[in-house]
């Protein structure tokens, strides 16, 4: 995986230095190579596909041979470019011989050129003779229209059916209405025969040319196959690199301490101009993170961000996060996210989720990443909360890294007093009644139900009555959470102002340095 990440990062540098590499679409050439191995002759289309691979290899060699590339390390990419097979002689021969998928060039052989020259001369003679008939005062009145056309490969003229006996020749076709017959006049019969014979010679010569061109490729089937594989790998590498540039990604550091440290991580499928970055650290001081808070607050987005970025890094992709972000290579990534209720199996939401959890508990190891959305939901709240705690404790003792979202107060309390557990929440702007999507690690989420209801204008008596129904312990916890939340927010604001002041001081220092 380190090799794959190195390839991606070097691909990014290469694109930025030298633009996008000249890699186009290539076909599956397996069947073509089998035909060559059997000494068979390939079609024009097949020859073009193989020519494209040789041409692309030549272009890629040229792309990688720029002098300025020597100033950077491209050791991970160099073997791919160096191993490409180039044969300029074959490419030139093919370019001279083939026009497109349907046409062989006159210059493919001297014989073909001579045949086609004769064909053109005879065609001109035929047309000249037929035009004399079409425009003669004697025969023009017999014609449906003054047109020379072709039927069954032979030049004919359209004659009105009632005058068919007035033109000596052979009828090759009749119009659908029966009002027109297409006649080959005797005067061009021999020329048409001669032209037909030349067409046969042309087809035979083209077949011979295709056989010769196929023969040129026969000794290089292994090289062609290798080229196709190398180009495919390079296409994949530069696809990852292009994606990295588009999302402003960085290369993650890979640690062996089973830790996740994502700095300003962004969900890769959300507009990068709109997504709110989150910094997430797991595995150092705790291995279970419980994210609580209201719906639509961004809990699941955070969950998915952790999973997607971990999977991206393990796949050799750069990640949408700042430099020095670090990820562990997990043996498996498990996720139970969303309502996968099964109608066909008559499973409820709870049963569906629990079926997934059962699979995870039986397959997860200490080196796994486990992501669970709303663990224990869909059943009695008390039972669901206790079951969720027990499952998370099992995963924690297993040693896996776990992130779970939840609404349960019991999980917040448990995480506050249990080693290896940590609370987190997604910040919510009470004034504007909308989530900021900013992750706050160390602070459990608040439902904000009363505050939101009050802001929206619900009668204060109703809110007070609802508040009085909550037990004192829960009220004390919510008050404590509010104090922690307010303190944390104030610290974050001070931190942001300090960082901004520091940046301004650095810029001022640089400005004064340039003035001196």
Regions found by a protein language model. Give the residues of each.
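Conserved amphipathic alpha-helical "coupling/scaffold" segments
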Residues: 1-111, 115, 220-223, 227-233, ...
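Terminal-proximal interaction/regulatory segments of ATP-powered molecular machines
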Residues: 498-516
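Extended, Lys/Glu-rich alpha-helical coiled-coil stalks
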Residues: 16-23, 47, 207, 214-218, ...
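Extended, charged coiled-coil "arm/hinge" scaffolds of SMC/Rad50-like chromosome-maintenance ATPases
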Residues: 85-100, 190-211
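Extended, Lys/Arg-enriched charged tracts that mediate electrostatic binding to polyanionic substrates
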Residues: 113-163
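Active-site phosphate-binding and catalytic loops of NTP-dependent enzymes
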Residues: 37-43, 65-69, 130-146, 239-250, ...
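Amphipathic heptad-repeat alpha-helical coiled-coil/stalk segments that mediate oligomerization
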Residues: 1, 55-105, 153-156, 160-165, ...
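ATPase nucleotide-binding head domains, primarily ABC-like/P-loop NTPase cores
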Residues: 247-250, 255-493
């Amino acid at each position: 995986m380190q090799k794959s990440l190195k390839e991606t990062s070097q691909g990014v540098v290469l694109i930025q230095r030298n633009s996008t590499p000249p890699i186009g679409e290539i076909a599956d050439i397996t069947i073509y190579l089998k035909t060559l191995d059997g000494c068979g002759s390939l079609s024009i289309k097949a020859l073009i596909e193989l020519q494209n691979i040789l041409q692309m290899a030549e272009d890629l060699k040229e792309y990688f041979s720029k002098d300025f590339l020597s100033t950077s390390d491209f050791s991970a990419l160099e073997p791919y470019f160096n191993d490409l097979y180039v044969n300029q002689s074959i490419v030139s021969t093919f370019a001279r011989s083939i026009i497109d998928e349907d046409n062989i060039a006159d210059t493919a052989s001297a014989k073909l050129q001579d045949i086609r020259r004769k064909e053109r001369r005879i065609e001109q003679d035929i047309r000249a003779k037929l035009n004399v008939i079409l425009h003669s005062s004697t025969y023009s009145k017999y014609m449906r229209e003054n047109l020379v056309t072709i039927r069954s490969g032979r030049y004919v003229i359209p004659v009105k059916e009632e005058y068919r006996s007035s033109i000596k020749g052979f009828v090759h076709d009749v119009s659908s209405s029966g009002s027109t017959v297409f006649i080959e006049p005797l005067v061009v019969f021999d020329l048409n025969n001669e032209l037909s014979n030349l067409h046969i010679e042309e087809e035979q010569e083209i077949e011979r040319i295709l056989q010769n061109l196929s023969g040129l490729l026969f000794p290089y089937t292994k090289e062609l196959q290798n080229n196709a594989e190398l180009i495919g790998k390079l296409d994949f590498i530069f696809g990852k690199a292009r994606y990295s540039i588009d999302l402003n990604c960085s290369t993650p550091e890979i640690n062996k301490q089973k830790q996740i440290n994502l700095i300003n991580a962004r969900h890769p499928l959300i507009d990068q101009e709109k997504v709110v970055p989150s910094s997430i650290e797991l595995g150092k001081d705790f291995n279970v993170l419980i994210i609580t808070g209201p719906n639509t607050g961004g809990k699941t987005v955070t969950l998915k961000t952790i999973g997607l970025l971990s999977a991206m890094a393990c796949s050799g992709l750069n990640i949408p996060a700042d430099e020095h972000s670090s990820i562990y290579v997990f043996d498996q990534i498990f996720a139970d996210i969303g309502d996968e209720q099964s109608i066909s199996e008559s499973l409820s939401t709870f049963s569906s989720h629990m079926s997934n959890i059962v699979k995870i508990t039986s397959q997860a190891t200490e080196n796994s990443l486990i992501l669970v959305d709303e663990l224990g939901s869909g059943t009695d709240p008390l039972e669901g909360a206790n079951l969720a705690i027990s499952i998370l404790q099992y995963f924690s003792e297993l040693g896996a890294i776990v992130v779970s979202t939840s609404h349960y107060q019991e999980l917040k309390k448990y995480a506050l007093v249990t080693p290896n557990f940590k609370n987190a929440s997604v910040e919510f702007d009470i004034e504007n009644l909308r989530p900021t999507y900013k992750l706050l690690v160390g602070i459990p989420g608040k439902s904000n139900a009363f505050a939101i209801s009050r802001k929206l204008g619900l009668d204060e008596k109703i809110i007070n009555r609802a508040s009085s129904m909550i037990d004192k312990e829960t009220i004390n916890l919510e008050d404590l959470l509010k104090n922690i939340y307010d303190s944390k927010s104030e610290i974050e604001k001070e931190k942001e102002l300090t960082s901004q002041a520091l940046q301004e001081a650095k810029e001022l220092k640089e400005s004064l340095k340039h003035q001196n």
